[in-house]
Regions:
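Membrane-integrated ABC transporters
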Residues: 1-204, 209, 213, 217-221, ...
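Hydrophobic alpha-helical transmembrane bundles that constitute the permease/transmembrane domains
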Residues: 11, 23-31, 204-215, 267-270, ...
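Transmembrane helices of ABC transporter permease
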Residues: 17-24, 273-328, 397-411
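An intracellular "coupling" helix at the cytosolic face of ABC transporter transmembrane type-1 domains
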Residues: 135, 146, 150-153, 245-246, ...
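Helix-loop-helix
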Residues: 291-308, 312, 375-449, 453-454
Length: 720
């Protein structure tokens, strides 16, 4: 998959935006547990009072607190409050740092004052020890004490307070502030409700931002993935279109179809999921760990154990399942291949009553794929239950450990709740990556297969400086000591072939099956390049011309008629779309196709099904010939194109064709002698070698191979 990342360059801007949105989404997601904790800790337990800094306090109460403050701290406090009648009010604009400083200053004095003014036995004992009678205002009595005695007493109390948990000091300070507000007649319930509303609104806003960010990420990632899929399909298509026959033989047609469709679809899906999950999961997981460490580290061991267990389980799971993932796409190829062969070969299968055999072939490929899929899915079914077990175990351990922490005063209930939520988010991030890991191996295989196509070197390529043939020479084809061997084959298919076809000549090629006839003519349009010698068109080696330039001069009719979905008209115009309607009709007339076209209600607008499945073999072949004629090329190549025609149609077509192509060069590969009797030259091939060349009469005298072929097909009277 990494190798295909270079095809995302066009979407770099979108990717940067997606990453920014993912960070925003993660920030909002990770803020929600903190707000939940604040609602429990501050909103419920502290009545909406956030810290030990009173917004409003009586002067007498402040004087009592100052008894237990350092002189510098008392001056600092005075700087932040202003008088309002008998009360002191906190100034409006105060920074977060200043508030934290005030919170630290007020904390311990508030604990001391709360203890001394309470009705507890502990308070009474402390007052008696200091010699303050019961019923006396302790703060008034303490204010009358000598400074040295008060300082000594304060040091003893502070020493004890220093041993207390920070959370206990904070809670004592909050309790003091709440009691002060109540004493002043403030509506504490309103303060609590205002805090709950404000925090709730912030939570809703965070949730809305999270939702909007997630929607934008889904939209943008889908767009990027679709764009990449579009580009890959275009690249693979253009690459495959540029393949020579050598590369087509390397990849089966079924495999190329799978790579262009299913494999690219796999990558597109994974890319869309990758931005939404693979990138988001680590951001969320790492962010969750940071938030946990910032709040409290006493229970992080629970997360550590959970993460180790998850990673160990995933490593074991993929060690078992990964080889099967790799094999899946190959098995899909095999099933596609078998299915394609069966569907295209149904007439032959029925004719030979081989339905049972083909059913077994299909069943074998299908069962193999199904078993592998089942094995992979069974492995993956363990994933979710194990993850849920770990998640639930983390929750139980957190509650168990957290209850002790709450009891000892080192944590608050809201902190435990936040830890559970952060733990779930961290584990969910692993769960998301795990869910993606089901698709990643198959996508990785698909990416390798697509990359294999894209990185395949095309054996037939255009030259850097192509040569244009002279306008004076048109329609000549020359083979100069040409030999050819298929890649990785030990022997030549054709060896040392030399001949020349001039403009207006008809050159026929004949020979036994497998003698190299089709291979020979495939060298002209550069479906292959000769391994030795040269093939020249219009006096120029075809390897020095662009493939388009060579093929624009050729009208090629393959051995098997091939039509495309559309209409009769669109198929005839395929090689030259801009020709007139009269030219289309003329091409059909020369190809003897009008006799069946005129019988159809829609005539030239008659639909042609995929592969021409709604016309007969002879009709398909005549339309293929009409297509080549309509192109009006310099050179016609007929690769045994008349074999599907009856003798009468064959004879009529050849007469019309000879008249139409008298200014062009015609090369015909034939099996039937009757098709080529009147050819200007006949090239005889025998096991890849040139056994003879000449006219029919010359070869009957000089070439034994030709004579045997001729005598096996026609009588002596017909050959005379």
């Amino acid at each position: 998959v990494i190798k295909l990342m270079k095809y995302l360059k066009r979407s770099a801007g979108y990717i940067v935006l997606i990453i920014a949105l993912l960070f925003l989404q993660a920030y909002c997601d990770l803020s929600l547990p903190n707000y939940t904790s604040n609602i429990i800790n501050v909103g419920i337990q502290q009545n909406g009072i956030e810290d030990s800094v009173p917004e409003k306090i009586r002067k007498t109460s402040m004087d009592g607190l100052k008894l237990f403050m350092e002189e510098d701290d008392a001056k600092t406090v005075d700087g932040f409050y202003e008088e309002e009648g008998d009360d002191l009010v906190l100034k409006d604009k105060i920074s977060k740092e200043d508030r934290e400083e005030l919170n630290d200053i007020f904390g311990k004095p508030m604990v001391i004052v709360s203890t001394l003014t309470s009705d507890s036995e502990e308070s009474k004992a402390a007052l008696a020890k200091m010699g303050i009678p019961e019923g006396t205002d302790p703060l008034a009595a303490l204010s009358q004490m000598p400074a040295e005695a008060l300082a000594a007493m304060k040091d003893q109390v502070v020493e004890k307070i220093d041993k207390m948990q920070e959370s206990i000091i904070t809670q004592a300070g909050v309790s003091y502030v709440r009691a002060e507000y109540e004493a002043m007649g403030e509506d504490v319930d309103a303060i609590q409700m205002d805090y709950m509303k404000a925090t709730g609104i912030r939570m809703v806003l965070m949730a809305l931002v999270t939702m909007m960010a997630a929607v934008c990420v889904v939209f943008l990632s889908s767009r990027v993935a679709a764009s990449m899929g579009h580009d890959l399909r275009g690249l693979v298509y253009n690459k495959v279109i540029g393949f020579s026959s050598r590369e087509y033989h390397k990849f089966s047609t079924a495999s190329l179809i799978t790579r262009c469709t299913n494999d690219i679809q796999q990558i597109q899906q994974v890319m869309a999921m990758m931005f939404r999950i693979v990138l988001y999961a680590p951001i969320l997981g790492i962010g969750g760990v940071i938030r946990v460490l910032q709040r409290d580290s006493s229970m992080t061991w629970i997360l550590g154990v959970a993460i180790v267990l998850i990673m160990a389980f995933m490593a074991m799971l993929f060690r078992i399942a990964m080889p099967k993932f790799t094999a899946l796409q190959t098995m899909v190829d095999k099933l596609n291949l078998v299915t394609r062969e069966i569907l295209t070969g149904i007439p032959v299968i029925r004719a030979f009553s081989r339905e049972k055999h083909e059913e077994e072939r299909f069943e074998d490929a299908n069962i193999t794929l199904t078993k592998t899929n089942l094995f992979v899915n069974r492995c993956m079914t363990f994933m979710m239950p194990v993850m849920m077990l770990i998640m639930n175990a983390v929750s139980v351990l957190t509650i168990y450990s957290g209850s002790y922490a709450v009891d000892s005063g080192s944590m608050q209930v809201g902190d435990v709740m936040a830890f559970i939520q952060y733990a779930m988010q961290i584990i969910m991030s692993f769960l998301m990556i795990t869910a993606m890991s089901i698709m990643l191996p198959r996508a990785n295989v698909s990416a390798r297969r697509i990359n294999e196509v894209l990185e395949t070197e095309v054996s037939v390529q255009d030259p850097e400086d192509p040569v244009q043939p002279s306008q004076d020479v048109k329609g000549t084809v020359e083979f100069d000591h040409v030999s050819f061997a298929y890649p990785e084959a030990g022997e030549n298919v054709i060896t040392d072939i030399s001949f020349k076809a001039e403009k207006g000549e008809t050159v026929a090629i004949i020979g036994s099956t497998g003698s190299g006839k089709s291979t020979l003519i495939n060298l002209i349009p550069r479906f292959y390049d000769a391994t030795e010698g040269s093939v020249k068109v219009d006096g120029v080696d075809v390897r020095k011309m662009t493939q388009k330039d060579v093929r624009d001069r050729i009208g090629y009719v393959p051995q098997k008629g091939i039509l495309f979905s559309g209409t009769i008209d669109s198929n005839i115009r395929y090689g030259k779309t801009e020709i007139s309607e009269d030219a289309v009709k003329k091409a059909a007339r020369v190809a003897q196709a009008t006799e069946f076209i005129d019988t159809k209600p829609e005539r030239y607008k008659t639909p042609i099904a995929q592969g021409g499945s709604n016309v007969s073999g002879g009709q398909k072949q005549r339309l293929s010939i009409a297509r080549a004629i309509a192109k009006d090329p310099e050179i016609f190549i007929f690769d045994d194109s008349f074999s599907a025609l009856d003798f009468k149609t064959d004879s009529t077509l050849r007469k019309a064709l000879k008249e139409h192509t008298k200014e062009a060069t015609t090369i015909i590969v034939a099996q039937r002698i009757s098709t080529i009797l009147n050819a200007d030259k006949i090239l005889v091939l025998d096991d890849g070698h040139m056994a003879g060349i000449g006219s029919h009469k010359e070869l009957m005298k000089s070439c034994e191979v030709y004579r045997q072929i001729a005598m096996s097909q026609l009588s002596e009277e017909e050959l005379a």
